[in-house]
């Protein structure tokens, strides 16, 4: 079957923004103008198409990134809507990995908020080309030029406005297109009636100045244009667009547009800009991977004739069709009903049906081609970050890294019947979300769930009740402490039982040493000459792992250590995997105790926005919470305080801040890193855990 849309006319884009910058409304308008939605949904009616989980409609925030296809001027645009709340950074990270370009939405009043910085850095990490859209130009306090300045200074980007607003706040009536050098006025409420007009006389100088900047940015990307520009010749709109496209795809400039999505102004030019400036799958470099059979680096170009390779980036439980696996095809073609290899797990899987998603309804399709985003039904073992590919040409694409959860709560089902339902439901939610973890506490037998923040866990508990009908009691949030070692130590583990019949014999010597933060756990086998047979080595590793998982000081997992197995002995008859696992576990506990173990706690990056008069009190309060103030700046009549504070001190902060600032202060925080707990506090925590 021939392609409906050639690759060059495909755009895979994400929409990224701070909470409340108007992301879902903008997406909704895009779907309206591209003809996919016949009546626009408003977020504050709880009817927006992209927000299709009940929790999202109630809270007016977007949690899951729904992937939607729409069409504009003979191009297919796949939009991935990403959440803006810090607790959901995993969703953003996950979608940026499979996008080719992004639209960053900023609020004309709030400008670059802390969350925008986080998301922007994530996009930098993946080298995603972006265009910026300054929304809410009709709001009190809207200031387009201030937002452009902040994009340059706070995000370190190179913003190039390709539009200027006509009017401001309630007089905002349209935009000036700097490329075509004309004014566009919106004449009706739906924003479908556009009238071209003369540029207002009082804006001519400003327009000339900014048009010059646009031409310069376009010329810098292309030598021919540069020569023409330096000769003082006027560049044509087509030439300017071609130059800007090159510069945007090379992540050298960020074209900036403006509008008011809620008032339906500025959305069609934004769609044009997506088509003009953001890359198609052909414009980005071939995707890198590893051939699992040879271990060599391999590449896949965006082409239907290459072998099939795709990355699963989201799993969702759908009430009607079961488990949906969203994936991005990097190369080749996949037909419904065919077999693929999950090269990450080395398992063969069958694709049942293929679906193209529109925010809340789905269309069944026969095949997907390179560059497309679709959902598959029938994949049993494929999780987020797995590669699926043609089994004759295996490749493992670079996966994604997800942060470890920082906050735990105990959860108990209200009735016996709920017990089984709860564990199935939690299992399913953990499949969907790699930053959500669950386990059973060995000492208390309680089920513990862990996530990236209080809101994250609230929504998980909410989904348990609604989707899986599980009633549960939830404990108080606890901090996810960790342990590590500061020194190096050797220890012996000997497990010998030889009393009649088959005995047990496992004997190991290990050395433990600290790794730099964030490196996790590393196991090195330095056994030579077969003092421990090869088949027992994995058992030693498993035993060490188990001991480190359950902690030594206070029962918290030990992280960032390297364990080296360097000696030991075995018995021809009595040795077994079990014996070596126990010996490994015994040695690990001893080694940690000898190597100066310490307790670590999660440190959060906190940003508090308060009116000037509450500044002193807020800083004093953060200091009393063991906070380190990093810096302060003024922003729109408010003061912004930035710092790092231990998570343990931040519980209930929202309420305290409200009462200290009479409801006018706001804050955001997200996980930054782990740090050693001060000795006096560590001793208290350890004693409490040991029940002294």
Swiss-Prot record:
Select a single GO molecular function from the record's annotations and give it. GTP binding
Note the SUPFAM superfamilies from the entry: EF-G C-terminal domain-like, P-loop containing nucleoside triphosphate hydrolases, Ribosomal protein S5 domain 2-like, Translation proteins
Task: State the Gene Ontology BP annotations.
Answer: ribosome disassembly
Q: What is its main location?
A: cytoplasm
Chain ranges of the tr-type G domain: 8-282
List where in the cell it is found.
Answer: Cytoplasm
Q: Which PROSITE patterns match?
A: G_TR_1, G_TR_2
Output the Gene Ontology cellular-component terms: cytoplasm
- Bilayer-crossing residues are none
Q: Which Gene3D superfamilies match?
A: 3.30.230.10, 3.30.70.240, Elongation Factor G (Translational Gtpase), domain 3, P-loop containing nucleotide triphosphate hydrolases, Translation factors
Database matches in PANTHER family: RIBOSOME-RELEASING FACTOR 2, MITOCHONDRIAL (PTHR43261:SF1), TRANSLATION ELONGATION FACTOR G-RELATED (PTHR43261)
Tell me its family.
Belongs to the TRAFAC class translation factor GTPase superfamily. Classic translation factor GTPase family. EF-G/EF-2 subfamily.
Functionally, this protein is described as follows:
Catalyzes the GTP-dependent ribosomal translocation step during translation elongation. During this step, the ribosome changes from the pre-translocational (PRE) to the post-translocational (POST) state as the newly formed A-site-bound peptidyl-tRNA and P-site-bound deacylated tRNA move to the P and E sites, respectively. Catalyzes the coordinated movement of the two tRNA molecules, the mRNA and conformational changes in the ribosome.
Quote the protein name from its UniProt record. Answer: Elongation factor G
* Organism per entry: Carboxydothermus hydrogenoformans (strain ATCC BAA-161 / DSM 6008 / Z-2901)
| Source organism phylogeny | Bacteria, Bacillati, Bacillota, Clostridia, Thermoanaerobacterales
Gene for this chain? fusA
